[in-house]
C-alpha cells in the first residue's frame, strides 16, 4: 500500500508557518528532505503557484519520479480571459518544475468557483484534465461551507482540508467519512496547525498568548498522556477514517524521521477535551495576521 504521507513544499520557496522553523529552507536542506522522503516510500509532493520560487527550486533539484499536486492561486483582479490565465499559469509551473503531467490541480481559493469567473474556471480545469495536463482536479477548502457550495456546482475528485487535534470542525458527524464515501479523495493538511502546536508552551508568540487557557490545558494534557506535541498531533490523525493523503511540512530530515516514526504508532487513547469550542481566531490561520497585537 502506498504511503499516505505527502511532503508539503511551502517552506521550500518562502517563509511559512510559526516560529524559528518557519524560515525558507536552504536548497541543500530541501534536497536532503526529498532524498530521505523517497527512501521512506513517500512519492507525492504538494505545492502551489503562490509558494514563492518553489517551482523553480524543485525543477533545479529534479523531481521527475515524484507525483506533484499543485494549486492555482486566487484569480487576480483585472483578469478577463480566465482560461488563458489558467493555462499560462499551469504551463509555466509545469515547465519550471519539469513535469509533463500533474497528479492533481487544485483551486486554492474555493470562492472563485462561485465568483463571476466560476463557470470559466471549472471549464478550464476540465479542459486541462481532458488534455492530460493533470490526472485529477479538486479544491483546497478551509471549512465545511466551502465544499457544500462547490458540491452544488460539481464534484471534485480531491478535497484538501485542514484537520488537527484542535481543529475538528470537519470531523463532526463523520463529515470527512461522508465525503470519502462519495468517491472523493480526502487530503488533510495543517496537522500541526502550521507548526503552532509544536511550540514550547513557555515561548508562545505574543499574538497567541491571549489563549492562555488553551495553552495551559494543552500542556497539562500532554503531560498526563506522556506525549510530545508532535507525537500527539500525528497519532491523532492516525485515528481518522476516510483519509487518503496527509500533507506534512518538515524542516529537516530529522524532523521528517520523527514524524514518520510516530505514524507507525497506534492512535492516541484519549483525546484532549477543551471544555468548549475553541475560538476560530486560534484555529484558522487566515485570521492570525488580523489579530496581531
Question: Predicted segment positions?
Answer:
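Short, acidic/polar
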Residues: 22-36, 81-97, 142-149, 233
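Active-site groove signature of glycoside hydrolases
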Residues: 94-113
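Acidic-and-aromatic substrate-binding clefts and catalytic sites of carbohydrate-active enzymes
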Residues: 46-56, 75-83, 112-116, 165-171
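Beta/alpha (TIM)-barrel catalytic core signal, keyed to glycine-rich beta->alpha loops juxtaposed to Asp/Glu
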Residues: 110-291
